[in-house]
């Protein structure tokens, strides 16, 4: 929960974008993912950065017309067989059929076109999991949040990663400046895009390589 801010009038209920802009401590979870074999293999051990960091809450009162309930993928571009983006879903509560666990369509990352509702409904799988589990999936995969039948909240963190040259959805690199000393290191400098920002002047272009 965060104190009311004017921008909250534009936010859909149950959807929280760019949580590190509200509190840098959300970034601590990135350290737990740093050595992920899935992430490193997906990006072929090249540099990758945080593209987005949000949160989602699902329960019976959530708007059934929310875009999270629609069949969607989290990237608008499609380049066949190219690792453009990786989704990371961190379950803060158990995911079950009654509280609207995520539904994904296996193999749908291999096609550009959106599947029909009938195809998705027939072939999707619902990811039932425990609190603390982490789901990695190709961002080309078509998916949606399930319908919750209970009032209890089903909470999750929703992250995406991209190659370092891909423009993030928020300028997370600016957060780095105000991080506590124990977080001012090469890992956060890289994953927040601080190391891959474009230069603003020639002084930055010709900076000492060691810096």
Model-found features: residue ranges?
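Conserved metal-binding segment of the jelly-roll/cupin
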Residues: 129-143
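Non-catalytic surface loops within mature trypsin-like serine protease
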Residues: 59, 92-94, 161-163
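Catalytic core of non-heme Fe(II) oxygenases with the double-stranded beta-helix
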Residues: 64-129, 166-175
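Active-site lining segments that contact anionic ligands and/or coordinate catalytic metals
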Residues: 124, 131, 152-156
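A structural signal for short, well-ordered beta-strand segments
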Residues: 52-55, 88-90, 157-161
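Active-site rim elements
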Residues: 23-28, 122-125, 144-146
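Non-heme Fe(II)/2-oxoglutarate
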Residues: 141, 146-211
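Non-heme Fe(II)-dependent double-stranded beta-helix
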Residues: 1-71, 77
């Amino acid at each position: 929960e965060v104190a009311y801010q004017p921008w909250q009038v534009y936010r859909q209920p149950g959807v929280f974008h760019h949580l590190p802009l509200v509190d840098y401590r959300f970034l601590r979870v990135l350290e737990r993912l740093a050595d992920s074999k899935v992430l490193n293999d997906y990006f072929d051990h090249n540099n990758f950065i945080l593209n987005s960091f949000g949160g989602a809450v699902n329960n019976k009162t959530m708007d059934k017309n929310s875009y999270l309930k629609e069949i969607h993928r989290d990237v608008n571009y499609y380049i066949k067989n190219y690792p453009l983006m990786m989704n990371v879903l961190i379950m803060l509560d158990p995911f079950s059929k009654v509280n609207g666990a995520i539904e994904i369509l296996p193999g749908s990352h291999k096609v550009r076109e959106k599947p029909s509702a009938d195809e998705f409904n027939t072939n999707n799988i619902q990811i039932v999991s425990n609190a603390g589990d982490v789901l990695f999936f190709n961002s080309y995969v078509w998916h949606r949040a399930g319908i919750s039948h209970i009032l209890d909240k089903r909470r999750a963190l929703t992250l995406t990663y991209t190659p370092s040259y891909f423009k993030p959805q928020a300028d997370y690199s600016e957060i780095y400046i105000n991080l506590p000393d124990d977080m001012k290191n090469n890992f956060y400098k890289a994953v927040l895009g601080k190391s891959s920002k474009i230069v603003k002047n020639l002084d930055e272009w010709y900076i000492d390589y060691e810096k």
